[in-house]
Amino acid sequence: MAVSFSLVGAFKGLSLASSSSFLKGDFGAAFPVAPKFSVSFPLKSPLTIESAHKKGAGSTKNGRDSPGQRLGVKIFGDQVAKPGSIIVRQRGTKFHPGKNVGLGKDHTIFSLIDGLVKFEKFGPDRKKISVYPREVQPENPNSYRNRKRESFRLQRERRKARREGVILQSSVDTCFCCC
């Protein structure tokens, strides 16, 4: 009798109707089940895809850009500048004019003489550009460059003489002490 009461107690809330909670999967009332744990996430916002191109109202006005102004230093320090050559193109006076240079109406600094460009400090926070006349220093006759140039000159002379049929004797080949 105790078994029948326990079975009746177990099936007490069940019915076989189509609207019963048993057929829908609700076992909580009939069978004691461990409590369900659920984790809730925040609602997802709609996915927005951004691209490199701006689209929208007035998109025909997008995609325009002006060409660069070609500003900056044109002749660097210790390089040769001819008269009238542009040294720096700038907006404003980032560089101030020094000796032998002029300042154009668009703040372009240009050379007035033929010489070397020098960038100098002008106060604590300014820079000055000057052009100094180039002093030509005499070349060392024993330098590598001069010896190489002389060697190639002798080779050209020998080659030219061979073509003409005359063989030149170099100054090293003739000896006046033994003969």
UniProtKB/Swiss-Prot annotation:
Keywords: Chloroplast, Plastid, Ribonucleoprotein, Ribosomal protein, Transit peptide. InterPro entries: Ribosomal_bL27 (IPR001684), Ribosomal_bL27_CS (IPR018261). One of its GO terms (molecular function) is structural constituent of ribosome. It comes from Nicotiana tabacum. The keyword Ribosomal protein applies. This is Large ribosomal subunit protein bL27c. One of its GO terms (cellular component) is ribonucleoprotein complex. Pfam families: Ribosomal_L27. Belongs to the bacterial ribosomal protein bL27 family. HAMAP family: Ribosomal_bL27 (MF_00539). Residues 1-51 form a transit peptide. GO terms for biological process: translation. The lineage of its organism: Eukaryota, Viridiplantae, Streptophyta, Embryophyta, Tracheophyta. The gene is RPL27. It is found in: Plastid, Chloroplast. Part of the 50S ribosomal subunit.
